[in-house]
Design a protein with these regions (language model features):
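Mature extracytoplasmic or organellar-lumen-exposed domains after removal of signal/transit peptides
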Residues: 1-203
Length: 203
């Protein structure tokens, strides 16, 4: 802020995904800086566009740099999305830790579980659309499909049911099996995006 007692939303407010990037950077113990990775690419690309616009033309080399920076920025933003999905797996894990003998520890235990799961699934669904994503590769598409399938359309609840379907075994068994799928999904996303394992566990 420039200290003028007002906020310029064009330059003094961090919106939407930039906040998630900053949270993941702050939560990293290995120096991950997704915010800088994205911002540097935006700034360089915009600088070249500004210069070429003023000049009235853009060279092939400049165009190639702009395209490269666009890909870098897009992939950095997607890393923020993936890291945030990973973060919500960890939040869901913490929520499940509070469930004992098929009972929530409190009303907030239930609301937090469902809120965190909804965030998780929403962010994970967002990994489908970037054409330069790791998951856009032919040999990776099935992995993302499996991750989304394993997350399901609702979390497993304290009674072991999921999306209105009762557990076939005990509630504890259903929750344990579901948690194993979520952790496997979390770890797979970590590998796909090249995140350090310690960050994946701690985000």
């Amino acid at each position: 802020s420039d200290g003028d007692l007002s906020i310029d939303v064009r330059s003094e407010y961090n919106m939407a995904i930039s906040q998630n990037c900053a949270k993941r950077d702050r939560g990293s113990t290995t120096g991950t800086d997704l915010s800088k990775e994205a911002m540097d690419a935006f700034l360089l690309g915009r600088h070249i566009i500004e210069q070429s616009t003023a000049r009235g033309s853009m060279s092939d080399d400049e165009y190639a740099v702009v395209q490269a920076q666009a890909d870098i920025a897009a992939n950095a933003v997607e890393k923020c999305i993936a890291a945030t999905a990973i973060h919500y797996v960890n939040d869901v894990e913490d929520d499940y830790d509070l469930i004992v003998d098929g009972e929530y520890a409190s009303k907030s235990n239930f609301t937090n579980l469902t809120k965190h799961w909804a965030e998780l699934k929403g962010f994970a669904l967002g990994l489908q659309f970037n054409p330069t994503s790791p998951y856009a590769a032919d040999d990776m598409r099935d992995e993302l499909k499996q991750i989304l399938t394993d997350m399901g359309d609702a979390p497993v609840l304290a009674d072991g049911s999921q999306n209105g379907v009762a557990a076939t075994g005990t509630a504890a068994e259903a929750i344990a099996a579901y948690r194993a799928k979520l952790v496997a999904a979390r770890d797979a996303m970590g590998v796909a995006y090249g995140f350090d394992a310690s960050d994946v566990e701690n985000w």
